Amino acid sequence: MTVTTRFAPSPTGHLHVGNVRTALHNWLWARKHGGRFLLRIDDTDVERSKEDYVAGIRADLAWLGLDIDAEERQSARFALYEAEFEKLKAAGRVYACYETPDELEVRRKILLSRGLPPVYERKPADAPVPEGVAPHWRFRLDHDAPIEWTDLIRGPQHFEPTTMSDPVVRRADGSWLYLLPSVIDDIAMGISHVVRGEDHVSNTAAQVQMFAALGASPPAFAHEALLVGTEGKLSKRLGSLGMASLREQGIEPIALAALLARLGTSDPVEPVTDLAPLVASIDFARFGRAPARFDEAELALLNQKILHHIDHAAVADRLPAAIDEARWKAIRPNLTTVAEAADWLPVFDGPFVPTATEAADRPVLRAAAKAALDIDWSADPWHALTAAVKEATGAKGRALFLPLRRALTGRDHGPDMAELLPLIAKEAAIARLTSAGGS
């Protein structure tokens, strides 16, 4: 059996961190098992589906590095749904219903007021059919067939169909709801594993019987705990936190993937620089049922750690041309986003205005300007410079290093000066030291 997973978003909005996590886990599982990862655009809602959102979905997956093996569109498969629907109708597994939404709501409230579950009550076969009313269609659950499956995350699952309403699968206008087309496509596309949020568990219960009614075995299911915010609650922000927003914040795609791959497990989140370790470690048996906490502060910190190790080639297309590999390696330990690299261009190439210096520091700076004239800039100039200044002035520790850093970079903190100074032209460094030292 070829492991085949699918990510099936509706193109009615932008992706957010919750459904991106689902896409990632489907992709990781397929790649771990040498299988296929499909993108299925669930665009049965023709009115609300937009091509701009489809393009955005593709772009977001590409940004994350999640390559797809095939793309399908539900809107191109209506003929297949119609044919399978007719088979179910002939077998008595779908039936027409004529209640209005208001009538159904009244019935629901009555049942709840009696302390009863609001389960849809089937009408007798000989119930009169109202004239001029187009029916909607429900799937008839088999009340004599308990629904069971072993979830890869939640373990054994059991549902009694007598406690469930027959689900609506087709509206009165002929349009399709989610449940039945999804099952038909999963069968036709050979989906072996369905990985999705735990809010789909009740859908799965109904779909298990749909698979059987269509003569197919259901795939394996893995229902993930939903993402919550740092306070342990569902967050509107998480529902709207899209990839564009994260890109604007300077989040690296591998940082987001590294965090989302491990959320919900007890495994540590590690600052990996490619997807391979995440592929190797994906294991649904390690996922728990407790809500998975998504912390933007944790993501930002992870992003920073990853930047400290990421290769120049991985970010070169987003760097100023003047930030070559040597400069990148020097400054990356001090960056929180790639965009901050541009802030270091004046340090390397100017124009540069040194910070005001204190009188007590000027002897150190004048000695440094003089010593720099005779230093070989290609052979560890920082250690040669500090040694010469220390010998000439007796300065050491903070009194030696901080004035030099300020004069050369205009900052109190930053990269290792032993790595940074060789990347500043000798003439520029001498000019800065001379200016800061005064007369």
Swiss-Prot record:
A motif ('HIGH' region) lies at residues 9-19. Its EC number is 6.1.1.17. SUPFAM superfamilies: An anticodon-binding domain of class I aminoacyl-tRNA synthetases (SSF48163), Nucleotidylyl transferase (SSF52374). ATP binds at K236. GO terms for biological process: glutamyl-tRNA aminoacylation. It comes from the Bacteria. It catalyses: tRNA(Glu) + L-glutamate + ATP = L-glutamyl-tRNA(Glu) + AMP + diphosphate. Its main location: cytoplasm. It is found in: Cytoplasm. Gene3D superfamilies: 1.10.10.350, HUPs (3.40.50.620). A motif ('KMSKS' region) lies at residues 233-237. GO terms for cellular component: cytoplasm. GO terms for molecular function: ATP binding; glutamate-tRNA ligase activity; tRNA binding. Keywords: Aminoacyl-tRNA synthetase, ATP-binding, Cytoplasm, Ligase, Nucleotide-binding, Protein biosynthesis. Catalyzes the attachment of glutamate to tRNA(Glu) in a two-step reaction: glutamate is first activated by ATP to form Glu-AMP and then transferred to the acceptor end of tRNA(Glu). Belongs to the class-I aminoacyl-tRNA synthetase family. Glutamate--tRNA ligase type 1 subfamily. Monomer. This is Glutamate--tRNA ligase 2. It comes from Sphingopyxis alaskensis (strain DSM 13593 / LMG 18877 / RB2256).
